[in-house]
Amino acid sequence: MSELYRFGISLEKTLIDAFDRHISAQHYKSRSEALRDLIREELLKKQWREGGSVAGAIVMTYDHHKRELLNMLLDIQHDFQETIISTQHVHLDHHHCLEIIAVRGTADQVEKLATQLKVQAGVKHLSLSISTAG
């Protein structure tokens, strides 16, 4: 673990009270842990905006009986084989499937993949969760 630095900050009482309620609801053990997570999240957003390298997961549900949807999804995934690390396919019921796609690459590549999958007719829902690649 890297060396820890202590510093002080000044906040309005209403802001710190709201923050304390938030960290309590999220079960943080301390303000420091919550603040570290907020800083990491903001740095990740900056990395995303600047096109840096990210890792993450695309989670989508779709109707596998929709004509030609499976072929389209597979074609798109093959076009992004350098971005996709792995996929997991789950049968939810007779008509619906859940697919989890682990990804790594530039933010632009990952977002382009997610968008191309999301707009296909028959895709019910798609969410993208990103994290740092390192």
UniProtKB/Swiss-Prot annotation:
One of its GO terms (molecular function) is nickel cation binding. Gene3D superfamilies: ACT-like. Chain A, domain 2, Met repressor-like. Keywords: DNA-binding, Metal-binding, Nickel, Transcription, Transcription regulation. Pfam families: NikR_C, RHH_1. One of its GO terms (biological process) is response to nickel cation. The keyword Transcription applies. InterPro entries: Acetolactate_synth/TF_NikR_C, ACT-like_dom_sf, Arc_rbn_hlx_hlx, CopG, CopG/NikR_regulator, Ni_resp_reg_NikR, Ribbon_hlx_hlx, TF_NikR_Ni-bd_C. Binds 1 nickel ion per subunit. Its cofactor is Ni(2+). Ni(2+) binds at residues 78, 89, 91, 97. Transcriptional regulator. Belongs to the transcriptional regulatory CopG/NikR family. This is Putative nickel-responsive regulator. It comes from Chlorobium limicola (strain DSM 245 / NBRC 103803 / 6330).
